[in-house]
């Protein structure tokens, strides 16, 4: 079956057809690393699911997910906390580890600070020779140069700025303009440019990095629903202005947001975070369509727990002597995923596969059923990793040295009276099937 995706650009589900038949490029907006990762940051696992599906369907797939390491929020956090410029690395550090259990790794993960020259070059295409010298070293992009601004959000420029009640900055010629390059003070990070020492505006980062790694136009651009306006609108505007109207991406896919207490989206800027730690299962894409705002329920988490229980049964069914995998992914699972990533339906089919193993009576029947399960496992984890380490399977993925290092980290946290961090590490190991026992001689561990 062909792949169908909901395209925010057209507001309908469309047949996916890549620009090049055997090659797909996908860019997804990653985190801004000014605070610890929270459970909402795990939602992009939806794009990992799409990445795996695309790799099954096409010979070559490039998945780019950026890291924003130079941003006003990062600068403000440093000023507030007194942290140095390495602080973003501390917040970025947990991301690979915490995404590790989710097994959600992109092909390329560029950092904004490593692409300043590309941003300067792109801004140079937007600043026309006849444009007056930028005021106070600030370059702005005139949105009205591109008439289709608003095509993602379905809002006109006048609607976007109507009622804003915000005074227009003196360096802007129009209230709809957005910053491409801004000056930096002595205490702020900055780079040399034709417009003086400064740093890039937020939106130019993704346009420049996507162009560098995927080209002027690529297949899929992903991100959260909250990025449609103004982030993705501005990316489209500046990219099309810079490249004679060429589109930035052909398909725009937006994942749902995590909403806390049924009120607002969960985000660092709103200060309503629940840090992920080991809450990976609240984000498993088995609880509904990737579009929309998903409420976080602190008690029960029935959808996530049901998904986890299903895959627990799946792994349990595969324990013992390994059975050879079938060549193809079971049709029902594949068909569900090809229908706009219908992960709830795919999960239900995985449950059926595991049930078939448990219900099989003869050795031949059981081997055939296990083979169908193995095909799903190997498709989902082509690098010979499990989809998500669970229980004993997760423990097996950790070496003794890894476990001992986490125990030492926990001991250091306890000595520093950082009991929340110590408890988090203990819970993290417990979720991976590692049981810790504290005694007079120190901490010992065993695999559950």
Swiss-Prot record:
GO terms for molecular function: ATP binding; cysteine-tRNA ligase activity; metal ion binding. Its cofactor is Zn(2+). A motif ('HIGH' region) lies at residues 31-41. Residues 79-106 are annotated as: Disordered. Its main location: cytoplasm. It is an enzyme of class 6 (ligase). Signal peptide: none annotated. Its EC number is 6.1.1.16. InterPro entries: Cys-tRNA-ligase, Cys-tRNA-synt_Ia_DALR, Cys-tRNA/MSH_ligase, CysS_C, Rossmann-like_a/b/a_fold, tRNA-synt_1_cat_dom, tRNAsynth_Ia_anticodon-bd. ATP binds at residue 268. It comes from the Bacteria. GO terms for biological process: cysteinyl-tRNA aminoacylation. Residues 79-91 have a biased composition (Basic and acidic residues). Keywords: Aminoacyl-tRNA synthetase, ATP-binding, Cytoplasm, Ligase, Metal-binding, Nucleotide-binding, Protein biosynthesis, Zinc. One of its GO terms (cellular component) is cytosol. Binds 1 zinc ion per subunit. A motif ('KMSKS' region) lies at residues 265-269. It is found in: Cytoplasm. It catalyses: tRNA(Cys) + L-cysteine + ATP = L-cysteinyl-tRNA(Cys) + AMP + diphosphate. Zn(2+) binds at residues 29, 206, 235. Belongs to the class-I aminoacyl-tRNA synthetase family. Monomer. This is Cysteine--tRNA ligase. It comes from Azospirillum brasilense. The gene is cysS.
